[in-house]
Design a protein with these regions (language model features):
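Short edge-strand/loop segments of extracellular domains
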Residues: 52-55, 106-108
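Short beta-strand segments
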Residues: 19, 44, 58-62, 72, ...
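Short conserved beta-strand and strand-loop elements enriched in small hydrophobics
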Residues: 49, 87-88
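Short solvent-exposed strand-capping/beta-turn motif centered on an Asx-Ser/Thr pair
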Residues: 36-41, 92
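C-terminal interaction-tip segments
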Residues: 1-29, 33, 90-113
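Beta-strand signatures of extracellular beta-sandwich domains
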Residues: 47-51, 100-102
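Intrinsically disordered, low-complexity Pro/Gly/Ser/Thr-rich segments with frequent PxxP/GP/PP motifs
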Residues: 53-86
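A generic structural signal for short beta-strands and their flanking turns/coil linkers
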Residues: 27-32, 44-46, 83-85
């Protein structure tokens, strides 16, 4: 199978930077949705970063507010990721946020001559 839909989920039980998804070798990925829900009733913030294959860090969302008992879709357009890139998330408060990413993994076709 060349392409497959997957999802990755994390319960942010700490305030540590947490890997949500890493693009596998020889693949690309399109993140179609990035949902964040707050379940503690107090509201929180989330930071989302993309780390490229060279280790450079790019902030996608910095201290994005998530309302009390709310679910927020962070992406307004798909996010294209390349091989070995990493999507990381970090909560301002432990045990308040859940994150779900819906992803299309793409296996490039082999070209023969």
């Amino acid at each position: 199978m060349a392409n497959s839909f997957i999802n990755k989920k994390v319960d942010l039980t700490t305030t540590d930077l947490t890997t949500l998804y890493t693009v596998p070798s020889f693949k690309a990925a399109v993140v179609k949705s990035l949902l964040v829900s707050e379940d503690a009733g107090s509201g929180s913030t989330i930071t989302v970063t993309l780390v490229n294959s060279s280790g450079a860090i790019f902030n996608l969302f910095k201290d994005k507010s998530i309302g009390s008992k709310a679910t927020t879709e962070l992406l307004t357009n798909p996010l294209v990721m390349e091989e070995s890139e990493i999507l990381k998330v970090q909560a301002a408060d432990a045990n308040e946020l859940h994150v779900i990413a819906s992803i299309l993994e793409i296996q490039p076709r082999e070209v023969t001559t």
